[in-house]
From Swiss-Prot:
Its cofactor is Zn(2+). Binds 1 zinc ion per subunit. SMART domains: G5 (SM01208). Residues 43-99 form a propeptide. InterPro entries: G5_dom, GLUG, LPXTG_anchor, Peptidase_M26_C_dom, Peptidase_M26_N_dom, YSIRK_signal_dom. Residues 155-1927 are extracellular. Residues 235-246, 516-529, 538-559, 568-606 have a biased composition (Polar residues). It is found in: Secreted, Cell wall; Membrane. GO terms for biological process: proteolysis. The active site is at residue 1566. This is Immunoglobulin A1 protease. Sequence repeats lie at residues 419-435, 436-452, 453-469. Residues 609-619 have a biased composition (Low complexity).
Amino acid sequence: MEKYFGEKQERFSFRKLSVGLVSATISSLFFMSVLASSSVDAQETAGVHYKYVADSELSSEEKKQLVYDIPTYVENDDETYYLVYKLNSQNQLAELPNTGSKNERQALVAGASLAALGILIFAVSKKKVKNKTVLHLVLVAGIGNGVLVSVHALENHLLLNYNTDYELTSGEKLPLPKEISGYTYIGYIKEGKTTSDFEVSNQEKSAATPTKQQKVDYNVTPNFVDHPSTVQAIQEQTPVSSTKPTEVQVVEKPFSTELINPRKEEKQSSDSQEQLAEHKNLETKKEEKISPKEKTGVNTLNPQDEVLSGQLNKPELLYREETIETKIDFQEEIQENPDLAEGTVRVKQEGKLGKKVEIVRIFSVNKEEVSREIVSTSTTAPSPRIVEKGTKKTQVIKEQPETGVEHKDVQSGAIVEPAIQPELPEAVVSDKGEPEVQPTLPEAVVTDKGEPAVQPELPEAVVSDKGEPEQVAPLPEYKGNIEQVKPETPVEKTKEQGPEKTEEVPVKPTEETPVNPNEGTTEGTSIQGAENPVQPAEDTQTNSGKIANENTGEVSNKPSDSKPPVEESNQPEKNGTATKPENSGNTTSENGQTEPEPSNGNSTEDVSTKSNTSNSNGNEEIKQENELDPDKKVEDPEKTLELRNVSDLELYSLSNGTYKQHISLEQVPSNPNSYFVKVKSSSFKDVYLPVASISEGRKNDKILYKITAKVEKLQQEIESRYKDNFTFYLAKKGTEETTNFTSFSNLVKAINQNLSGTYHLGASLNANEVELSTDDKSYIKGTFTGQLIGEKDGKHYAIYNLKKPLFENLSGATVEKLSLKNVAISGKNDIGSLANEATNGTKIKQVHVDGVLAGERGVGGLLAKADQSSIAESSFKGRIVNTYETTDSYNIGGLVGHLTGKNASIAKSKATVTISSNTNRSDQTVGGLAGLVDRDAQIQDSYAEGDINNVKHFGRVAGVAGNLWDRTSGDVRHAGSLTNVLSDVNVTNGNAITGYHYTGMKVANTFSSKANRVFNVTLEKNEVVSKESFEERGTMLDASQIASKKAEINLITPPIVEPLSTSGKKDSDFSKIAHYQANRALVYKNIEKLLPFYNKATIVKYGNLVKENSILYQKELLSAVMMKDDQVITDIISNKQTANKLLLHYKDHSSEKFDLRYQADFANLAEYSIGDSGLLYTPNQFLYHQDSIINQVLPELNRVNYQSDAVRNTLGISPEVKLTELYLEEQFTKTKEHLAENLKKLLSSDAGLVTDNEVMTGYIIDKIKRNKEALLLGMSYLERWYNFSYGQVNVKDLVMYHPDFFGKGNTSPLDTLIELGKSGFNNLLAKNNVDTYAISLASHHGTTDLFSTLENYRKVFLPDKTNNDWFKSQTKAYIVEEKSNIEEVKTKQGLVGTKYSIGVYDRITSATWKYRNMVLPLLTLPERSVFVISTISSLGFGAYDRYRNKEHQANGDLNSFVEKSAHETAERQRDHYDYWYRILDEKGREKLYRNILLYDAYKFGTNHTEGKATEVADFDSPNPAMKHFFGPVGNKVGHNGHGAYATGDAVYYMGYRMLDKDGAITYTHEMTHNSDQDIYLGGYGRRSGLGPEFFAKGLLQAPDQPSDATITINSILKHSKSDSKEGERLQVLDPTTRFKDATDLQKYVHNMFDVVYMLEYLEGKSIVKKLNVYQKIEALRKIENQYLTDPADGNDVYATNVVKNLTEDEAKKLTSFDSLIDNNILSAREYKAGTYERNGYFTIKLFAPIFSALSGEKGTPGDLMGRRIAFELLAAKGFKDGMVPYISNQYEEDAKQQGQTINLYGKERGLVTDELVLKKVFDGKYKTWAEFKTAMYQERVDQFGNLKQVTFKDPTKPWPRYGTKTINNVDELQKLMDEAVLQDAKERNYYYWNNYNPETDSAVHKLKRAIFKAYLDQTNDFRRSIFENKK
């Protein structure tokens, strides 16, 4: 340890004879002392001389002076060091060895060198004799004699040239010895000026007259330690003025020594109980025998009078090295306080300990360890302790009661019982042999003269006022009780001027050793405040400068010489460092029980020991007063095992190969060894303890059985006291519960024995207590006719964790006030949570259920069937699943599957449910409350909320009841009835209220929410379409009205139930443990996680070592995970030695890593050191042999077949159900391949077996064998779906084997896996993985849901990444995330974790995303087989093999082709919604941030496929995309031969492919279906009577080709002028640059209609003027409206357009252009005669005029006229003000107010008519639509004079010899049109040809196309008008 400048140190004594180079057992001790140094004042310059000497030049006496170390610091004003070198044996050049740290070691002996030299040095002193410095060497042999040798100054010759002189400042470090070729440095001999004489005095009158002398131990101990051995403890007592040889007592006692650094300056700490104990334990107790009549003093002796002689041994040494961490004590600084009474001390600032890491070399002789040496160290310095010393002169007041003073409880003269006293540290002495500041001394009780009386911590007896030792009887090692006698009146201790006698302190002796009352407190006694017996705690840790084994022995001290003190003066204390021991805290009782010590706050006593020293010239006096609370034991606490936070105890026995749990005993078993205890904790894992004994006793007049489990080092806290072993009691059998049940197993047993009894719950029960076989249908068999009540004394109780229905059948029974929590039930037949069936007037009231039910047939949240039975004030909350395909009839309901009978009812109840079903027949029903309600059964005052997703279109499905019809009688009078019910359920393929509508339904006051999505996916006209269902909607309420309506219907709220008795959180209470600090409560809780099985005292001890600036002090620790580099370690036994990292995971999911180093095993726990923190860590598992378990279970596990009946029974499914959708078969095989390795991990992470015990291991073997199928299923499931990583950490092992990662320390991984495997087929379906985590894993992990768990893993292991970044780095799917080109949108899309985020992970984990189950399949993709495209409104998924064919083969360019195409597709989708974002208002823009699912078809090609793949793959396809992604997601897409279809929330590509260009156009079509009502149409919805296809094809979707001659808007494809077909383009070149806002859109359409209207006008003029009647008949047709009754809603106000050929009379009327409008004329060129049905796929032709302005006079227009007028309104008024009002229900409320209404599914709705729209849009400007149309034409006619010149390709010239033609005015254009019209008229019936193509067969069409294209190009996509005076 470093010696700081100016520090005075004189050391001349030795501690234990076991310390040395050679063990005392071989009769020799080798000691090497550091030469004492002279006093050096601060900053004084000193001369230092290095003289280099060869060892051959030394005499034998000089060799004995050799110090095997490197000189460290300047100490005196003139120093000479002889640096000794040894000639290398082969004369090779070598580096000087690093003999140790100059900062830490004071003595070093190299084993091999000493063995050769045989040097023996015990102590060195310097004394001036006739102005000559003489070194005195005391050589000590094992027999106790010494030899004194004087050594004079050395001379050197061989290495004279290397001599060097230095001028250095006091306290500076000395230079290192030089490297000398051919020589090796071995040590030094120091020559100095000071003497080693010293004295100790408490108070002095003058330099010549001593008053009282205090005997202090000043000793030096080398840095070696022996193993525990029996040695001779030599102790010496020297009387005053006597040279009498020391008395020696031989004590035989096994012990291990502790190493005290001889050069440290130790200081006493009273920072806290913990700091004090650590500080004081730097030395262990010693034993000393003193003659009762011989007085002890301190005197200056002549060394020749102390000669000891002996013979030395020189054994051969071998060594090895180990690493040890120790604590460093802190220094103490004394400050004068003039306001504090003289002689009084007070702690101003508490000290803090440092730490040291040492590499220790262990020497052995004949394979037995004899000593240890410290090779290297690293040190963290401690912080000092500051003590105030009073200087105020005060008058001592004796016998004054109730005085508020510094020192309380003990006063001078008080009788104090002795107690165990820790040893004093070594003293630092001056150059005159006088002690400096005394470290580690407790304050002593002083007399009224300020002199010490009782000195509790001194190794020798207290001396009398004459300076002579009191006579003290010899004291043996303390083993008994000590009770404290507290003084009544505390007094303040002061010091007066002048010499005074010290009052003698009478001391009451201990019971074992009588002591004269006049004697002072002696070694082995202390002031003790504990009431209980105590014994020293084991010291199991190492201290700085020492190595201690567990049973620390005592160290004897040799007294030092002293000489009379001189005048006293004050001197500041010098800096120094000291070492703190690791252990501190509690003491232990006789049986090893840890006893908490009093805390600081409970002690009012200060004891002061004062030590005065002065130097030889009398100029400086050092006075030390250290403070210690004598009520506190400061020994290290004994480290033991303790099972804390025990929540439950289970006793098991093995009999005839069967294990049985006992909740009571009949008698004392004869074979307790066949029993074991499972100790369950609320915080830690289960621990198995072997039973040692079972005995009978009585308590409270009851016969009880005491079960005792014994384990090494295990103690149990009972009533705040610790006792060995672990005990608890069981009742005598016969006291079974009869009415009030607190055990589920007892309840089940009792009811099964008496099915008609009355039963009350007395607590919440856990169904896990009862294990069911796979054949059991329920817990209680038979028919229950009694009563079960779940409430007692106003408390509501629940049954948790049902895995099957509670009852099989109920008949006339009553069940009330009962809650069923966390049910997870699956079955092959009809199932319900409470019972399968209730009959005969069963009453169910206030029964509340939450959980999940899955079955193959009927399912009810409470009951599968209620026949003539009632349910009232009850509820269900959870999920119900039946997705099996079967032809059997079944009924599914949120509360009841089938409610039947006149007396059957549901009243004042509710269901909050998510139902997944696959009904495909009319006798399969699904309802939010009940599936089938028949035979006069009724539901009233009830409601349902949630979602019903029925895959197929058929079946009876609805939000309240699936069907009310009585199928048995077929009589409407006996149908079920609904009264005052509400549906707040989203329904797919069903209705809102009932699933089947018929005349005469018995329904009244039914309500539904407008906000609900209620729709059916149907096939219409060979197209799959999604249609909203208005059938059976009842009264539709706004979302804002729903909550109040529910409250009006009923106010049912499930009660708050009592938690499980074992689920209550029980935290350890550390507050009563010694050294507890309230501000460290969190730290103790954290350390408890690091040391889960250690006793509280040990936890407090290490908790007090945690620095306040550390994270461990500031944050709550959730878990600690061992790692080997970056890999998580689970198999602790196999990796015990190789673990090198510890990850600490905190509650905020931050983490930090520490280096981890294995130290040793303690009580079958592997113990590790954590970095340089001084803390320990033990894994949450005991070490035991697992091979026997693995070897016995492995064969049976390997025999399990995945497709076996046993596996199906475990899954709970019928033989015909395929296992395909589990997607586990391949993984099941892989799991079995490495079972042995997995079982090691599993057993290492499961329950703790504290010892190898066949009964306990057999229990585990039996459990695994009985559940082998479930275990393998659970393991396979987690290995399949959690095999992904965070950086280098694979999460699979964390999920499987570290369920405590999030702080749930009491989870059993084995039980979790078994429970998962037994959770049922539905729960293990791959598609249910999100729910499976929530149901089967979250509660075991201490988490809530899958996605927060994944995020928290990421925060721990990849804190610098986002969730999405991690996800993309982990998945093998090819992900394209395309942000908008609009800056404000792009910014929002970068907001991680928001609804705006473009990140795939953020979107698929959104609560609104239907397929959140995609995450795990994407994370575990084994290969790149799937692509994902994310844009603002959609999220697309497809397979690479969808594009695989001969052209793009898997081993060719398939991957690059797909990935390039994916990027192009993403850009198109981005551009499309950038277009929409620009033209919508803010409300509409916000709604674009959504997730519409896009799916490519399940059509996968091969390398031999021609063109597009057409074969549809099913879920058992081996294709990797299907097997690893689409199948596990479970979206059963219905395939057809069409291009694509939409369902409202998804788009499915069929014939078209997502990544093709036609797929882009399809995208605009299908996304219109998903967007029109709520977004494009401003939220007003589609106009009544207009079908979904009206809005897509021909209106809002993009044109199929850029050459399409249709009135449409290209919103998605970018074209280029360099395209080969640019000359044919008629659509916008680039929508991203053309449309910047809605104004741009209107301008484009308006300017386009300038051309359209002009050309139509010219063509119309030509027809009416140039053609005869018959030619007009051929060129034109007429359009009319037809009103048919709508088959869905029964209304006849929706127009259907019919195109007819003209009659001759009609043709004759066409004499002017206006007559074309007035007679509803349109061109025959591209509009064939026929009916244009509503909701059709029609487009408005760009060059075939519709002159008509036909409106829907009764209501809604037809599909042709509606599209044409919509575009004309867009041109005239814009999108928001023109098109949207026309095609939406924007004016519905206006219509309603005007009395224009229709009835939609029984509800009155406003009917928006064309007349109303015209009036509203144009504010009454036009009276008719014909007037509007005429005005539009006239607007262009008025501009004809301003027509711009245009040059176009002459269509009359044949290709490729096209010429150009230029027109300058309309007249020229009219002439060309006349010619073209006449040319077409000359062709015979060309419009009627089947193969007619206007592009090639019509001159008019070709002319109009050429003109349009020319103006399109000339105006740059109609950015400008074709008229001069318009923009």
